[in-house]
Amino acid sequence: MTMAGQTINDRLLAARHSLAGQGLAKSVCKATTEECIGPKKKHLDYLVHCTNEPNVSIPHLANLLIERSQNANWVVVYKSLITTHHLMAYGNERFMQYLASSNSTFNLSSFLDKGTVQDGGMGVPGGRMGYDMSPFIRRYAKYLNEKSLSYRAMAFDFCKVKRGKEEGSLRSMNAEKLLKTLPVLQAQLDALLEFDCQSNDLSNGVINMSFMLLFRDLIRLFACYNDGIINLLEKYFDMNKKHARDALDLYKKFLVRMDRVGEFLKVAENVGIDKGDIPDLTKAPSSLLDALEQHLATLEGRKVSAANTPTQSSSSAFGTAAASSKFDTTNGIDEQLKAQVLAEEEAAMNQYKSKVSSPTSSGAAGASAALTNPFLSSPPAAQAGQPIVDLFGAASAQPAAAAAATKASDDLLQLGNPFADMFDASGGGAAAVGATGNAGDGTAKYDGGAGSSPFDWGATDDDGGAAQ
């Protein structure tokens, strides 16, 4: 039997608290009646006001709500959880601090209401019976407990911290603290997503109100989560191996949670929440994850497979469009680009070889290089009529025959300047190096004229002209 929407039990309990002068207990009772609607705004506003009053006992208020959650009726239990959640979100922080520091939590992991099976659920047509609401009560209580544990671990509420690029708490956090903070945030977000209701489950005013509070928390939690991940990626390439491994694992978990958040937001859109209040979740490109994995593999000294290795190294998590366009995620490295890179490497190697070691057909240049090499055990005999500038010899006036008879490596430990005599000579570059090759062979040529530097080299191009 009900009177003006309230049951006889509700009215008797309120009267008892009034006679005992327990105004706070009466307000809690009014907010958690057996009527299958959400707690009334006037009762919630009064309780929020009580949390800001210095003469109101916060522990007493919290214990009254926890006591109401032990009721056998699912509506009373659910409304006590909703009232607690509302005070966490809009009440004074003292209320949250007490729940975080107290061992008094909602012990509803095995809650099951088998008694409320009347038609329509407390007189509401189309409502769900208590047996079907029990799983959502258990999940909701678990989330509120996790919310309290998060505050205990971090000393702040993720749903109330500043967000954004300029003043965001997680955007300005250092890497070490960030790696400890994000797992706590992930645990709270997981507990929220485990509520896992569908549109057809939101069939009465009680569960609808809890869903709106969860939706509010989800938007703020994910915004905070996103700030933390952005900060993590900005610091990723400066981390050591251990931190980089943890950061990559956190980013992979973030990608999984993005899909689950998207499913929750679809339910919110289906039940009529304004699309302007629902954020648009844009996923990062898959190349970002590839770049992070490649960097970690580099730190660990592992080889990265060709299919996952970009052709250009990136010092940032966000590669340029040019680099990403050259990377084919399905077929590995583009064959044309691969051939081009191999050709460039081969050309560079040939040019290097032509400078270091001349072929046997280069004539005087080959003989000159062999004669002046101090590391040869038996230098070849000098060819007559070819003056050689021996940079490793003791003096420029030494004959070629004497240089051939004495090993040049025997003179390496002398402390004299081997270049002094060459630059003191009156000819000023009288000896010329005849290293001129055929046109188009890419070899070097020096004129050796007076007034020109012995290091003024030019490269002969294909047309026979000197390229500057």
Curated annotation (Swiss-Prot):
Domain of life: Eukaryota
GO cellular component: clathrin-coated pit; clathrin-coated vesicle; extrinsic component of presynaptic endocytic zone membrane; Golgi apparatus; synaptic vesicle
Entry-linked Gene3D superfamilies: 1.25.40.90, ANTH domain (1.20.58.150)
Domain ENTH: 16-158
SMART domains: ENTH
Principal subcellular localisation of the protein: membrane
Tissue occurrence: In embryos, expression is seen in central and peripheral nervous systems (brain and ventral nerve cord) and Garland cells. Coexpressed with clathrin at presynaptic boutons of neuromuscular junctions.
Annotated SUPFAM superfamilies: ENTH/VHS domain, GAT-like domain
Composition skew (Acidic residues), residue ranges: 459-468
Compartments it resides in: Membrane, Clathrin-coated pit; Golgi apparatus; Cytoplasmic vesicle, Clathrin-coated vesicle
InterPro entries: ANTH_dom, ANTH_dom_sf, AP180-like, ENTH, ENTH_VHS
MF (Gene Ontology): 1-phosphatidylinositol binding; clathrin binding; clathrin heavy chain binding; phosphatidylinositol-4,5-bisphosphate binding; SNARE binding
Sorted UniProt keywords: Coated pit, Cytoplasmic vesicle, Endocytosis, Golgi apparatus, Membrane
Chain intervals for the UniProt region annotation (Disordered): 438-468
GO biological process: chemical synaptic transmission; clathrin coat assembly; clathrin-dependent endocytosis; clathrin-dependent synaptic vesicle endocytosis; neuron-neuron synaptic transmission; phototaxis; positive regulation of clathrin-dependent endocytosis; receptor-mediated endocytosis
Membership in a protein family: Belongs to the PICALM/SNAP91 family.
Job of this protein: Assembly protein recruiting clathrin and adaptor protein complex 2 (AP2) to cell membranes at sites of coated-pit formation and clathrin-vesicle assembly. May be required to determine the amount of membrane to be recycled, possibly by regulating the size of the clathrin cage. Involved in AP2-dependent clathrin-mediated endocytosis at the neuromuscular junction.
Subunit comment: Binds clathrin and phosphatidylinositol 4,5-bisphosphate.
Name of the featured protein: Phosphatidylinositol-binding clathrin assembly protein LAP
Organism of provenance: Drosophila melanogaster (Fruit fly)
